[in-house]
């Protein structure tokens, strides 16, 4: 089998297994389905967007949101999310408890507290995301004006951030093509409280958009071009 046929076969097998487990549920007791899978409608973070592309079986929330289950606990995707907010059961990625790259810089990390009310019929499941401390990732941006002291400006930008024990990257962008490169040892010294300095780099200037002249019906081909 080729790669596509293999992932399709794995997805079909997974759906069959979910159905088999659902049929085997004793509804007299609360039931939780646990799976490590990448659902096609999940929101990915950072490097997950490229690492998972085309490699995981295409499974949808619908395949897991079976009424036989009171809760579906998923692992694999790093971002906390409930993929079945409008129905039951909750289909939830608790997410990772640590950040792994800058794509997760602003994402809260923690765990999910689940309560299944067995006194109600049908059972009611409530969830609560509890945040926990996680390694911080910090991105620093500095803009160097024409004639500006690049080192001093970047150091000033660093000083405005809490970098203690954080994973840090610093970018600078100059208003002039010939902006002087900063003094790297000085920047490293300013970043000494960081747990790790991942990158110090200049951002490429964004090309300015050039507005095209309007073309009118009165123009001939040579004028329009």
For the regions a protein language model found, what residue spans apply to each?
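Accessory, non-catalytic peripheral segments of nucleic-acid enzymes
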Residues: 116-225
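Cofactor-binding loop segments of dinucleotide-utilizing enzymes, especially the Rossmann-like FAD-
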Residues: 36, 96, 175
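Active-site glycine- and acidic-residue-rich loops that bind
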Residues: 8-15, 101-105, 177-181
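His/Asp/Glu-rich metal-coordinating catalytic cores
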Residues: 1-92
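A conserved active-site cap/scaffold subdomain adjacent to cofactor or substrate pockets
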Residues: 62, 69-147
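Generic recognition of flexible, low-complexity loop/linker segments
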Residues: 21, 101, 156-159
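Gly/Ser/Thr-rich active-site loops/lids in small-molecule metabolic enzymes
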Residues: 55-60, 96, 100-102, 189-199
């Amino acid at each position: 089998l080729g790669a596509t046929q293999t992932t399709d076969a794995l997805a079909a097998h997974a759906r069959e297994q979910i159905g088999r487990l659902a049929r085997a549920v004793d509804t007299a007791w609360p039931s939780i389905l646990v799976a490590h899978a990448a659902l096609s409608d999940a929101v990915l973070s950072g490097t997950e967007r490229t690492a998972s592309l085309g490699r995981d079986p295409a499974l949808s929330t619908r395949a897991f949101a079976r009424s036989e289950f009171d809760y579906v606990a998923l692992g694999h995707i790093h971002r906390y999310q409930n993929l079945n907010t409008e129905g039951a059961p909750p289909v939830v990625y608790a997410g990772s408890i640590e950040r792994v790259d800058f794509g997760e810089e602003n994402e809260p990390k923690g765990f999910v507290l689940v309560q299944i009310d067995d006194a109600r019929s049908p059972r009611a499941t409530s969830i609560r995301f509890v945040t926990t401390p996680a390694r911080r990732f910090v991105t620093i941006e500095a803009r160097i004006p024409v004639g500006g002291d690049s080192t001093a400006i970047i150091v000033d930008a660093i000083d405005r951030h809490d970098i203690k024990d954080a994973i840090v990257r610093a970018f600078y962008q100059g208003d002039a093509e010939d902006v002087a490169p900063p003094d790297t040892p000085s920047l490293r010294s300013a970043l000494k409280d960081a747990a790790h300095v991942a990158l110090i780099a200049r951002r490429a200037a964004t090309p300015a958009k050039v507005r095209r002249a309007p073309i009118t019906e009165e123009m001939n081909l040579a004028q329009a071009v």
